[in-house]
Amino acid sequence: MRLRFLLTALTLAALMTGCTVRSLNPLYGEKDVVFEPALLGTWAEHDDASSNWTFQKSGENGYRLVSSEGTKTLDGRLVKLSGRLFLDVTPKDGDDSLEIPAHLFIKIELSGDTLRTAMLDADWFDKTADLKTLGLSYIRINDKVVLTGPTKELQSFAVKYGGDETVFSHLQDYRRTAVDLAK
C-alpha cells in the first residue's frame, strides 16, 4: 500500500514538474471546449486498481480531477480538434503559490468503460533537432522544453501530430470503477 502511494505520488510529481512537456498557454479557446458527461466518475489504472482519478464537473464545461490519494487536484478542459480529444489540465488554484500554472496536454480516447491517455513525450521533444521546424515557439528551462506559443499554434501542432504515437506516447489505460450520478 505504501509503495503504491509512493509510485502514484511520484507519477503526479512528474506530471506537474519537469518530466513532461508543459505550455504557458492553453490548448483551447472557449469555442473549442467540449463537455463529455461520460468522463465523469472514477477511473482506475488497468494495472493498479488502487491508483485512480475521479473526474467531477466543474463549472459549465470544466472538470475537476482528484487523485485517489487526494494529493493532487487538477482543473481540466476537454478540447476537440479534428475529431481527436485532448484534455488540457492545470494545477488547481492554491496548490503551489511558487509554481507557474502551466498547461499539460493529454490526448484521450474514450470507449465505453475504457479510457486511454497519451502524454506529449518529453524525450521526443528533446531529440527533435529543431523545434522551429515543427512550428512551435518554446524556451528551455533547466534543459526542459516549455511551449510558449499562442493557442492557435499549439492547436496546429496537436492536429498535425495527434495521431503520432512517438509524439503522444506514455500510453496508460484506465477502466471505469464508478459512475458519477450527478451528471
Where do the protein language model's features map onto the residues?
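Bacterial N-terminal signal peptides that target proteins for export
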Residues: 1-7
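Intrinsically disordered, low-complexity segments enriched in polar/charged small residues
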Residues: 7-9, 180
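C-terminal motif of bacterial Sec signal peptides marking the signal peptidase cleavage site
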Residues: 15-18
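Calycin-type beta-barrel ligand-binding domains and close structural analogs
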Residues: 20-38, 46-183
